């Protein structure tokens, strides 16, 4: 409790997109920069206005240099459910905290921001004039002010029922904006090398933030594909490395994904993507490799593992192997010839994710994070289906809906215990293991007549 007295209150203006991902992102970034999530607000839900307590303005600025879920942050001077409550709150704010930004040598500007309602210019001016009791001594400068102050009004979430008066009103000093522009500047549409399942730029940055990726980290993606997740991590200064079982994807060969382009060009590869954004210096390597048979020496190499495993829908789930474990004509003690190309077999989802967790537990540094997508069949989903490992602690579990009956969940886990050989078999002793095996049939359920029937029934019910 004593700590909370030393914290300053800030107002976060959140983007109304990927709502479930916002809280874990902010919590992860605050931990990354030496803060801790503290708030008197009971629930967050869909509201774009969050009141947080943060130790310093430097941490608030660092937070905004990373977040793609928040638009802006303000030092909160006052708030209330009516103009009168706001003015009373402002009058109780310590004058000594205001003075450095209101003195005669400074310039300032006041902005009005409304959520779910549009005000006329006359209404905006009226709200600004009502703040004349504040000790502003500087000059107004609308083009390049030294300090920007904002009145933010919340009119609720229902666009079909907009109240006459706001539910909440806030006043604060603008500190910084978030990194929402990265979503556009790193858009997949503008990218040199893409595939069928290239990750959306916004989600890539969210995953990097959930993983607490920072400068000089080593980040690994065992299902690298076209490397979209590596780009986001490299943007934050991490060195990136990946593997994939698909030779053509790793080497940029084969048919193109883009419309009106039949074959991939000579320079379509992951390294070229990093070069496109000026991030080539963070590229370590990308190899053709089977995630079910990692070729790593024992040790902890990675600060984070950020990945999007294939679900068997648009990309197949494969691993190397053979019905005959040894190629014909090769004795047990002999190595396979260089010309031998391993046969690929189907790779059950439950096996894939358990292998991924074992690999993360073995190769992550203590405190390192694993961030990955888990596809689920919504009608049968339970929290017990999320794979677990004794060395990994679940940090967050966020849902992104894909359809009325399917979704994928962004799972973030942190390594909290040193890996021991017996840990890789722990799941077999757990009651959680049996329901999780249902993921083997995710693809069948996705394409099944059951799925189509559910969609048809939902449609007829709505009619």
From Swiss-Prot:
Superkingdom as given in the UniProt entry: Eukaryota
Keywords, ordered alphabetically: Acetylation, Cytoplasm, Methyltransferase, RNA-binding, S-adenosyl-L-methionine, Transferase, tRNA processing, tRNA-binding
GO BP of this protein: methylation; tRNA processing
Gene: TRMT11
Protein family membership: Belongs to the class I-like SAM-binding methyltransferase superfamily. TRM11 methyltransferase family.
Catalysed reaction, written as an equation: guanosine(10) in tRNA + S-adenosyl-L-methionine = N(2)-methylguanosine(10) in tRNA + S-adenosyl-L-homocysteine + H(+)
Subunit structure as annotated in this protein's UniProt entry: Part of the heterodimeric TRMT11-TRM112 methyltransferase complex; this complex forms an active tRNA methyltransferase, where TRMT112 acts as an activator of the catalytic subunit TRMT11.
Organism annotation: Homo sapiens (Human)
EC number of the protein: 2.1.1.214
Residue positions, PTM N-acetylalanine: 2
GO CC annotations on file: cytoplasm; mitochondrion; tRNA (m2G10) methyltransferase complex
Keyword Zinc: no
Function: Catalytic subunit of the TRMT11-TRM112 methyltransferase complex, that specifically mediates the S-adenosyl-L-methionine-dependent N(2)-methylation of guanosine nucleotide at position 10 (m2G10) in tRNAs. This is one of the major tRNA (guanine-N(2))-methyltransferases.
Protein name per UniProt: tRNA (guanine(10)-N(2))-methyltransferase TRMT11
GO molecular function, one term: methyltransferase activity
Compartments, record wording: Cytoplasm
Keyword Membrane: no
Listed InterPro entries: DNA_methylase_N6_adenine_CS, RlmKL-like_Mtase, SAM-dependent_MTases_sf, tRNA_mtfrase_TRM11
Pfam families on file: UPF0020
């Amino acid at each position: 409790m004593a700590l909370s007295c030393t914290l300053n209150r800030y107002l976060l203006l959140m983007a109304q997109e990927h709502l479930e991902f916002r809280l874990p992102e902010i919590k992860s970034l605050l931990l990354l920069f030496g803060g801790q999530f503290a708030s008197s607000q009971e629930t967050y839900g869909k509201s774009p206005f969050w009141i947080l307590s943060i130790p310093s303005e430097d941490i608030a600025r660092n937070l905004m240099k990373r977040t793609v879920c928040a638009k802006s942050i303000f030092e909160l001077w006052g708030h209330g459910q009516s103009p009168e409550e706001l003015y009373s709150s402002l009058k109780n704010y310590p004058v000594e905290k205001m003075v450095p930004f209101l003195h005669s040598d400074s310039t300032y500007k006041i902005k009005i921001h409304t959520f779910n309602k549009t005000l006329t210019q006359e209404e905006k001016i009226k709200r600004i004039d009502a703040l004349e009791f504040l000790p502003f001594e500087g000059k107004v400068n609308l083009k390049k002010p030294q300090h920007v102050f904002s009145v933010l009004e919340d009119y609720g979430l229902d666009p079909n029922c907009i109240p006459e008066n706001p539910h909440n009103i806030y006043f604060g000093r603008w500190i910084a904006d978030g990194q929402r522009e990265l979503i556009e500047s790193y858009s997949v549409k503008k990218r040199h090398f893409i595939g069928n399942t290239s990750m959306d730029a916004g989600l890539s940055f969210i995953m990097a933030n959930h993983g607490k990726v920072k400068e000089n980290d080593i980040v690994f993606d065992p299902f690298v594909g076209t490397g979209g997740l590596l780009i986001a991590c490299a943007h934050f200064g991490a060195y990136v490395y990946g593997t994939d079982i698909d030779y053509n994807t790793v080497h940029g060969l084969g048919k193109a994904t883009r419309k009106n382009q039949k074959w991939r060009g000579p320079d379509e590869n992951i390294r070229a993507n990093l070069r496109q954004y000026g991030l080539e210096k963070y590229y370590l390597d990308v190899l053709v490799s089977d995630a079910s048979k990692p070729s790593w020496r024992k040790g902890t190499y990675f600060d984070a593992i950020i990945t999007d495993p294939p679900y068997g829908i648009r990309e197949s789930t494969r691993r190397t192997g053979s019905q005959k474990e040894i190629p014909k004509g090769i004795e047990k003690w002999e190595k396979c010839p260089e010309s031998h190309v391993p046969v690929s077999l189907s790779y059950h989802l439950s096996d894939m994710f358990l292998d991924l967790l074992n690999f993360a537990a073995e190769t992550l540094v203590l405190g390192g994070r694993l961030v990955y997508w888990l596809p689920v069949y919504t009608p049968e989903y339970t929290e017990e289906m999320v794979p677990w490992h004794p060395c990994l602690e679940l940090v967050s579990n966020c849902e992104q809906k894909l359809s009325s009956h399917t979704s994928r969940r962004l799972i973030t886990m942190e390594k909290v215990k040193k890996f021991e050989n017996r840990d890789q078999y722990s799941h077999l002793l757990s009651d959680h293991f049996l329901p999780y095996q249902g993921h083997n049939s995710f693809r069948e359920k996705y394409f099944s007549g059951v799925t189509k029937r559910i969609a048809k029934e939902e449609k007829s019910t709505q009619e």
